Amino acid sequence: MKNDDEQSSLMVAVIGIIPVIWFALLVAPYLSSGLMGILDGVPEAMNHPFSIRLCGDSVKTVLIFLLSYGMGIGIYISTKKHYRRGEEHGSAKWGNVKKINRRYREKRFTKNKLLTMHVRISYNMRKHLRNVLTVVIGGSGSGKTRFFAKPNLMQANTSFVVLDPKGENLRDTGYLLEEKGYEVRVLDLINMEKSHCYNPFVYLKDDNDVQRLVTNLFKATTPKGSQSNDPFWDTAASMLLLALIFYLRYEAPEEEQNFPMVMEMLRAGEVREDDDQYQSPLDELFERLEMKNPEHIAVKYYKDYHSGSAKTLKSIQITLATRLEKFNLSSLAALTATDDLDLPSLGERKVALFALIPDNDTSYNFLVSILYTQLFQQLFYLADHKYGGRLPVHVHFLMDEFANVSLPDDFDKILSVMRSREVSVSIILQNLAQLKALFEKQWESIMGNCDEFLYLGGNEQGTHKYVSELLGKATIDTNTYGKSTGHSGNYSTNYQNTGRELMTPDEVRMLDNRYAIFFIRGERPILDEKFDILKHPNVGLTTDGNGKPYLHGAVDRAVASISLGDSLEGELTDDSLESEDYELLSDEDLEEIIQKYV
């Protein structure tokens, strides 16, 4: 806009040369008569504006007038001021809720992502040229679940991946989602016997996926803030794990490709510190594989691991066993032995995948970290290789308790490429400090990649300052008063303007719990009420509207169940059973009976 104004001014200045020359030629015949002659002659010349007479002073007069004109233009430019009345110290102000909502929403209510009571945004990113990546920040009790997560689940308009501490979202909205035609799948790390199974090995398409799985596993099982002075042990342990996984991937039957089998192989790799020549069953296994295929990738990694002394090998095994020790638990071993989640299907039909984690124990969160990484890989691959770059069903990650799960170091890059593939995330945090702790160098990039930022309130000073600076400064009018006393006292009032934050950090801290502050890229900030869940049209199908709670893992929701039917009804009664009337059945006998009635 500034360049356009400069071009317009230049054009006017050039055009102004024409009347200057014309006027100079009118004045030229009177130049020799002095100032009085010019003053007397100009009115007469103006009566006949087109009667121009050339004379000996014409050229000199034109040059004098052009020089004066040029000097005038120069003085004008040098003294020109650029005023923005009322915006001298800043132009920040609150956005118009209705106008902004009208610009970004779909007319059909359930086609939108809900942000505040009166603002929603369409998932059709081509409509408004914004991504639907959202950062939600709110302290405990600010309503991150009630005012944001639940309302968007109740929309039932995308596939969902929900990190659900305590299982509250699943219990309250699972029945609604099933009624809306969703397949509900649950990775339950609280009550694992009720969980669908998840086997990361199923989603390994190539050797790079194996490498990423091992890298992510080691990162996710590293305690926060810990730094190893000697990375040798982790590097060597990762080589051993790569060897075991590659062996299972290429040599074992499909039902043995899982982490429980990795633990079996690790236990078979006995090392005797006093006997470097001892060969364990695991050594013999890889020796046979080397004889069969010396260039096998599993053999290469195993030989790299096995190049040390027996004492070193023992330490490496202990390091790896420490990383994988959770898989010794029968509950986790059973959960990861097979797979029921079918991750790619989330991009093809409406599926709600809930990952339930304890809110007071992070022991098993590493499995959710692996799940996230593989979900991104699977969905991106599906979009690129089957659907021309865009999934047929949008997938929305609701990342509650975002700070409790380890994510890839390049998560900011993942954010930047997911939009085009119909994948979005909502990063839910308690404060900005959590994001800075997770991504010390990339946190600003993550915030910048998200076009929406919703602040629900909190009590962390760094977040207050960040929100205040994001709101910007406004220009306000101020008065100053002066009064002097004495024999000739006087009273004065001065009017001036100054800059002031739209909300100071203290005012951000004091934000009414009914309200939220919402930012969308390229728009004025919005102050609006939080979404009232009881006014959602689908609330009657949730527990908040007295609907049925969703109970996963019940008999009627089992993946497979066995019924003996009515054939035995009435045959057995308490009176007919004596101690000598029954016997314990072997597994073979039990299987034969089951096959008879199934």
Language-model features and meaning:
Residues M1-S142, R146-P151, E193, S484-T485, ...:
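Basic- and hydrophobic-enriched, low-structure N-terminal and domain-boundary segments
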Residues V42, H48, V59-N112, D207-L217, ...:
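Short alpha-helical interface patches
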Residues K93-N101, N112, T116-R126, R146-F147, ...:
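A broad, low-specificity signal for short, low-complexity segments enriched in glycine/proline
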Residues R130-V423, L438, Q442, T498, ...:
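P-loop NTPase motor domains
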Residues L176-L177, P200-Y203, K441-S445, E469-A474, ...:
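Short secondary-structure boundary/capping segments
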Residues I357, D361, E401, L429, ...:
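Short loop or secondary-structure boundary microenvironments that flank
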Residues L415-I517:
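Conserved ATP-driven motor cores of ASCE-family P-loop NTPases powering translocation/secretion/packaging/pilus
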